[in-house]
Amino acid sequence: MSLTTIIFDNGGHNMKIGTIDSESPRLVPNSIVKAKHEKKRVFVAHEQEECSDKFSLFYVRPIERGYVVNWDTQQQIWEKTFGSMDVEASTSRIALTDNNYLIPALPDVSSEILFDYFGFTEVHKTSASTLVAKHSNKINNEKCAVVVDSGFSWTTVASFVNGMLIQDSVIRIDVGGKALTNKLKDWVSYRQLNVSEETYVINECKEDLCFVSQNFDESMKEARNRFQENTTMKRYIMPDFHSTFRGVVKDVKEPHDPQIPSIHLGVERFAIPEILFNPSDIDIDQCGVAEAVIESICQCPEALRPALAENIIVIGGSSCFPGFRERLEREVRSMLPAEYGLNVSNDVINPQTHSWHCGQELLTASKVPWINRKDWDERGDSLEFSNFFQTLVQSDELKGTRNFDDQREKSPKEDEDF
């Protein structure tokens, strides 16, 4: 019997889900929402599209700081999502990105839910970064890769060799899209209009107006110009969810009806994304994303570092800001030895869905270690841990590596790992 294969990237903001033969994944909110104007209904997952008035939404999210902390809520969201798909779990298998799977100390009942509650036939668990690194290795024939994943809950940087994670190279920054939206809400509420409850609207405002400055000091000088001479300043007209359903960006010089709620964004447009490069701006004592890339590379054996620097792949929704890739490349270049080459890949068409598409190509072209129901019943977590540790390599194991082909021969069960 041929099984339907589902690829499921379980993100903190949006889930990316689709069958292996889909052209692109569906983006489904990974949250439950209560709207102020709807007294008797909650909107679960894709039902949020049916919510006509998105002012003052209250969110319940199963994922906090990048990990699932409320499995009951997550199960409810998954049930609604799977129910909207034209597939039967009993004749399907699912590849799931699951960050809890990477941390043995955290509760992870995803396999139990997928097997026992939904009844999937086979399950494969991995991470979004691993999908991208494996794709780079097996499909693009790149031996080394640095994956920068700037998502909703965090930004992580990890180095890989032959598709295997170098464990010491993982760097986490506690800044993602959620923190940036919350900070923009704070700044606008303090300076202009109280938008503390308008998470949905301000998140869209951030997406529509913010960009990464290539020179922060010069951008600040420009932002100090007088109101009418300031080319950075833009007006964002708030949606009313009757005639307009997304905010509209206008130049401040254009005439505007003062009765229509609007906000002005000037320095905020580039100061918000700047937090990704300088978290200390909001008192987070961590390095920025460029320094994290350098630190990740430096945690790897010296013989691998030039190849790592030549294949940096950027994914995640928070990397979609205009100028992000160029700024990252410029800052990393300034910190790398002059003899190293550098390539921050520009082949990523959509950073938000790139890991899903990598999984799609990998599952089509490669063997992966699926766990079936029988194996799960017999071995459970021990089987998952075994598969997980086969995808890791310690830096000490790579010391003395002279070329990648030698290391490739030493990689355990490479053709079976994902």
Curated annotation (Swiss-Prot):
Entry keyword Ribonucleoprotein: no
Listed Pfam families: Actin (PF00022)
Entries under SMART domains matching the protein: ACTIN
Coarse class of the protein's main subcellular location: cytoplasm
Subcellular compartments: Cytoplasm, Cytoskeleton
GO cellular component: cytoplasm; cytoskeleton; Swr1 complex
InterPro entries in UniProt: Actin (IPR004000), ATPase_NBD (IPR043129)
Assigned keywords, A-Z: Cytoplasm, Cytoskeleton
PANTHER family reported for this sequence: ACTIN
Entry similarity comment: Belongs to the actin family. ARP6 subfamily.
Protein name, as recorded: Actin-like protein C08B11.6
